[in-house]
Amino acid sequence: MPKMKSNKSVAARFKLTGSGQLKRTRPGKRHKLSKKSSQEKRNLSKQPLVDKGQVGMYKRMMLV
């Protein structure tokens, strides 16, 4: 049987922390930044944790 493949789009979007939680990036920080205030850009830089209900699904996709 061949090896299982992880979902590469999920693996690129989420990072696993040491305690097993997942961090994600906020959308809207790639382009058209001149229209956004410094405060908005700073808040977009923060990486929130994924909700508890979705963590299991994403971990299965990442084969963690």
From Swiss-Prot:
One record GO biological process: translation
SUPFAM superfamilies on file: L35p-like (SSF143034)
HAMAP family linked to this entry: Ribosomal_bL35
InterPro entries documented for this protein: Ribosomal_bL35, Ribosomal_bL35-like, Ribosomal_bL35_CS, Ribosomal_bL35_sf
Disordered: annotated segments: 1-56
PROSITE patterns found in the cross-reference section: RIBOSOMAL_L35 (PS00936)
One Pfam family it belongs to: Ribosomal_L35p
The keyword Electron transport appears for this protein: no
Membrane recorded as keyword: no
Compositional bias annotation for Basic residues: 23-35
Protein name per Swiss-Prot or TrEMBL: Large ribosomal subunit protein bL35
GO CC list: cytosolic large ribosomal subunit
Annotated keywords: Ribonucleoprotein, Ribosomal protein
Gene assigned in the entry: rpmI
MF terms (GO), sorted A to Z: structural constituent of ribosome
Family named by the database record: Belongs to the bacterial ribosomal protein bL35 family.
Domain of life: Bacteria
Native organism: Chlamydia felis (strain Fe/C-56)
